[in-house]
Amino acid sequence: MNQSLLTPFGTAIERVEAALTSLRQGQGVLVVDDEDRENEGDLIYSAQSLTNEQMALLIRECSGIVCLCLTDERIKQLDLPPMVEDNSSQYGTAFTVSIEAKVGVTTGVSAADRVTTIKAAIADNAVPEDLARPGHVYPLRAQSGGVFSRRGHTEGTIDLMLLAGLKPAGVLCEITNPDGTMARLPEIIQFGQQHNLPVLTIEDIVEYRKVTMEKAS
C-alpha cells in the first residue's frame, strides 16, 4: 500500500482520531485493510446511528452486500449459527445466517427495511424471535481480541465503535468502482474526498490500540 497517499489525512493516530470523531457525529469512515490481504476498502457506519440515507449510499455505491458486525456475545444472544459448519473462505470471514426483522419490514431489501432489521438486531432487549432467517442483512461475528486477533474489517469495525464509546455494532460494505471492480486506495481516497469521509487503515487501528494501551499501563 502506498502510505504516502494517506499523508493528507495525517498520521496513523490522527487518522484514527478523525474516524472516531466522525463516528461519534453519526457519520461514516473508510477503512482499508492490508495490501497483502483483501486490499479493499469498506465504508463503515455505527449501527446505532445508521440512517436510511446512509444505507442507501451503502447499497448504491458499494457492493450491495451489507454486513452487520457484531460481538460474539451479541451473536450468542441472537442465537445466530454460522452460515456454514466448515468455513473454508480465504480469510475466515465469520458470516452467520442472514437475518430479517420480523416486524416493520416489507420485502426486507429496501434501505429502510435493512435499517429496521439492523436496529432490531442491536436492540438491548433483542431476542432470537425478533429475527427471521434468512434475510437481506449479513451478520459477521468479530473475534474478541479485535484487530490484535484478526486484522479484518469486522474486527476493525468493532474496535472503532468501542474506541468511540459507541455500542459495539457496525455496518460495512465494500467500496466498488462504477464499472463493478473493487476500489483500491486511490479510488477509495477519491471517494472519501467526494463524500467528506475520513480514511484510515487496519494498521492504523493496530497502532492506535498499542499506543493507548501503553499510555494506560
Curated annotation (Swiss-Prot):
It catalyses: D-ribulose 5-phosphate = (2S)-2-hydroxy-3-oxobutyl phosphate + formate + H(+). Its cofactor is Mg(2+); Mn(2+). Pathway: Cofactor biosynthesis; riboflavin biosynthesis; 2-hydroxy-3-oxobutyl phosphate from D-ribulose 5-phosphate: step 1/1. It is an enzyme of class 4 (lyase). D-ribulose 5-phosphate binds at residues 37-38, 42, 150-154, 174. The keyword Magnesium applies. Mg(2+) 1 binds at residue 38. The record marks 136, 174 as: Essential for catalytic activity. Pfam families: DHBP_synthase. SUPFAM superfamilies: YrdC/RibB (SSF55821). GO terms for molecular function: 3,4-dihydroxy-2-butanone-4-phosphate synthase activity; magnesium ion binding; manganese ion binding. Its EC number is 4.1.99.12. GO terms for biological process: riboflavin biosynthetic process. Belongs to the DHBP synthase family. Catalyzes the conversion of D-ribulose 5-phosphate to formate and 3,4-dihydroxy-2-butanone 4-phosphate. Homodimer. This is 3,4-dihydroxy-2-butanone 4-phosphate synthase. It comes from Shewanella woodyi (strain ATCC 51908 / MS32). The lineage of its organism: Bacteria, Pseudomonadati, Pseudomonadota, Gammaproteobacteria, Alteromonadales.
